[in-house]
Amino acid sequence: MSEPIENLTVDAVLEAVGLFCPEPVMMLHQKVRDLPAGGLLKVIATDPSTRRDIPKFCVFLGHELVAEQAEEGTFLYWIRKKPD
């Protein structure tokens, strides 16, 4: 990644705190649909299964997982929607 995560400008945030599989990925799917092509989404989740599910979601649908972080039981993801 060319710039620090703190410097990224996000277009939308998805808070999936306290939700468990499959809800975070279902919500992610809808939120990505609403983004413009190339838009950046930040996801905040607490379900550890998102560490597996969100990267697979990005690969399967062609979106870019720009960055991910884990902080004391909270999982953060920055996802760039694929171009049209």
Curated annotation (Swiss-Prot):
GO biological process, one term: tRNA wobble position uridine thiolation
Catalytic site positions: C21 (cysteine persulfide intermediate)
Keywords tagged on the record: Cytoplasm
Cellular localization per UniProt: Cytoplasm
Similarity comment: family membership: Belongs to the sulfur carrier protein TusA family.
Record's keyword annotation contains ATP-binding: no
One GO CC annotation: cytoplasm
Main location as per UniProt: cytoplasm
HAMAP family in alphabetical order: Thiourid_synth_A
Protein task: Sulfur carrier protein which probably makes part of a sulfur-relay system.
Domain of life: Bacteria
Name listed for the protein in its UniProt record: Sulfur carrier protein TusA
